[in-house]
Structures are given as structure tokens and as C-alpha cells.
Amino acid sequence: YREIIDPLIVESVTGMSKLQQMKADSRDKIFQLKDIGELENYCYYVAGVVGKMLTAIFSQSKNISRARSRLERHNVQFGLALQFVNVIKDYTKDIERGWCYIPLTVTKKYDIDLDSIANLTPGQREGIVKDLLVPAVSYLDSTLEYIKLLPLDEMNIRMFCIIPFVLAYMT
């Protein structure tokens, strides 16, 4: 699988290194993404590329290879869905580590001070969830389509995909 994995690892590492450089260039104590576009870009490099990789690996099965082009329409969104949910779920831990994946456009909209992220009002918490959940739900819908395209007789692969999907959906 090296011929599948290696170029995608390079793509992912290259994208993540750009984000690391953006943080290094920032003078802020907490590095924050500017907008939803930057968040989607980040999610692509850390998770969307994994969706591409898994599809290429899964497609080594003759049963799945027949659906490959249709799966490829949804594979990036699979990763984005899971990562968006992680961003929503883990934002306080991320901020403690000096990263804020909740875009500046969202924190400004709800007058959120990153230094007091642990003391958000219910309205501020709901605002974060609402603004990030809209794209996340779209990505989750696409993920469900991806799973439905997997042949029924590929039960292990289907379960491999269903379990994180259900966990993300239930979060």
C-alpha cells in the first residue's frame, strides 16, 4: 500500500506544516484560524486526506473498486465530518494547548474571549455549536452516503466506517 499511502502522507504533512508555520509566524499566545475556509483547509489536511487514503486502500477489493468513483465524491467529507465534530467537542483542550480551531469569525460573532473559554455563557456555547454544526451535518450526510455505497458483503470495512460515524453523530 506504500504507493497509495506515501503521496497522501506527503500531502497531509505539507498542509499541516503550513499550519505550523502560520502558528510560528503568529505573535498570539493562542493561534486561531481566521474563518470557516481555514478550518475546512485544516480539517482536509488532518482528516480529509485520510478519507482519500482509506478509499484508495478499500478499493483494492474488487467489490469496492466498482464503487470507487462514487466513493471518491464523499471520501474527503468523511474525514471533514469527523474532524469538525472533534473541533466542536475538544475546543477547550485545544485552547489549553495554544490552538483555537474555532474560527475568529465565530468567536467575534459571539463576543468570545479565548482567555476565558472555560466560562462561556450558554448562548456562546450554542453559537459555536450552531455555526460549526451546519457544515458538520452536511459532511455527516455525505459520510452516510459513502457508507451506503460500500458493498454489504464488505462488513468489516462497513463497520470500520460506521462506528466513527455513529460516534460523531451521537456527539
Give the role of each language-model region.
Residues 1-149:
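Acidic catalytic motifs of isoprenoid enzymes
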